[in-house]
Amino acid sequence: MSRIVLAEAYRTPIGVFGGVFKDIPAYELGATVIRQILEHSQIDPNEINEVILGNVLQAGQGQNPARIAAIHGGVPEAVPSFTVNKVCGSGLKAIQLAYQSIVAGDNEIVIAGGMESMSQSPMLLKNSRFGFKMGNQTLEDSMIADGLTDKFNDYHMGITAENLVEQYQISRKEQDQFAFDSQQKASRAQQAGVFDAEIVPVEVPQRKGDPLIISQDEGIRPQTTIDKLAQLRPAFKKDGSVTAGNASGINDGAAAMLVMTEDKAKALGLQPIAVLDSFGASGVAPSIMGIGPVEAIHKALKRSNKVINDVDIFELNEAFAAQSIAVNRELQLPQDKVNVNGGAIALGHPIGASGARTLVSLLHQLSDAKPTGVASLCIGGGQGIATVVSKYEV
């Protein structure tokens, strides 16, 4: 069978919570990336067989946000679309589903990725549909409820990171150092233009005058210092060590790519970036969900007949510094291969988009000298997902 390849991989800049993208729905961020894929590839949009996009915080957007993003992005109405929710793994799961649909013979070319607007997630007034007889009622934050809370233990994702702190005896100093390093790496990469090739500028309409053109990630903090990080209070536990500074942000963004057969790429005159080698998924205790990538990576590597030492680049989502440190310890990863341009602590974590974002960033780093990469994420509820890719060679 023809190999499954990836091409035209892009992402939006990542906006901070309540920042530059606060008035832009997730589906419009997704549409921006889809539009770029179609315009840059110059393929006939009718060639697309399906659009699959991850999106976690869907409430209030309208039916099937992936469908809205696809049509707004220029995909014909005749092309079907569907939306995936695997929490933080949604964007990468969408790409896996595209891969599987092609292997099954259902599709030849798919746009797949993820999108999220955490800024636009609504407040919920539960049990209000049929009215209240008496008493006060409380609004529920859909972002916290559907994106950041472990339903099994009824606590915030930050507590799952604190659980790993205890299990792996991770110090506050280690976490702050990890966060500082992420910020510094991302800042250097941004200043050097490393992200320019993967980022699609986004137009943000203004009340008066021309729209703002946003072309850089909003949340990178080059002025962060170890001392400033050390001054932050624990965010989730009275005597804890997980803070707003050593955890990923709350963000808005989108990322996507073309997934297709090698034969289809040749027929359309497209130059693939990479070959999709394998995927892996895991289930772990929800209370330590952050360790999920370990088994997922092992499974993905085994399916591609590779081991850790065969991998040149790791893009691992930094949900929390503690979680990342635990995964790195378990896998004994060489740190000069991991998130060399920073990760989600600096860049941000728009949950439905991050799976695709990590892979987009990985694809743009592949080279003849570093041809093999792994992208992986932990997933709320106690799961992990990973993929192995290799630089495309004819």
From Swiss-Prot:
InterPro entries, sorted: Thiolase, Thiolase-like, Thiolase_acyl_enz_int_AS, Thiolase_AS, Thiolase_C, Thiolase_CS, Thiolase_N
Active site: C88, H349, C378
Keyword Zinc appears in the UniProt entry: no
PROSITE patterns from the UniProt entry: THIOLASE_1 (PS00098), THIOLASE_2 (PS00737), THIOLASE_3 (PS00099)
Catalysed reactions, as listed in the record: 2 acetyl-CoA = acetoacetyl-CoA + CoA
Gene Ontology molecular-function annotations: acetyl-CoA C-acetyltransferase activity
Keyword Nucleotide-binding included in the entry's annotation: no
Coiled-coil regions, chain positions: none
Keywords: Acyltransferase, Cytoplasm, Transferase
Cellular component terms (Gene Ontology): cytoplasm
Record EC number: 2.3.1.9
Compartments (UniProt record): Cytoplasm
Name of the top EC class for this enzyme: transferase
SUPFAM superfamilies cross-referenced by the UniProt entry: Thiolase-like (SSF53901)
Source superkingdom: Bacteria
A Pfam match: Thiolase_N
Family note: Belongs to the thiolase-like superfamily. Thiolase family.
Name by which UniProt lists this protein: Probable acetyl-CoA acyltransferase
Source species of the chain: Staphylococcus epidermidis (strain ATCC 35984 / DSM 28319 / BCRC 17069 / CCUG 31568 / BM 3577 / RP62A)
Lineage start: Bacteria, Bacillati, Bacillota, Bacilli, Bacillales
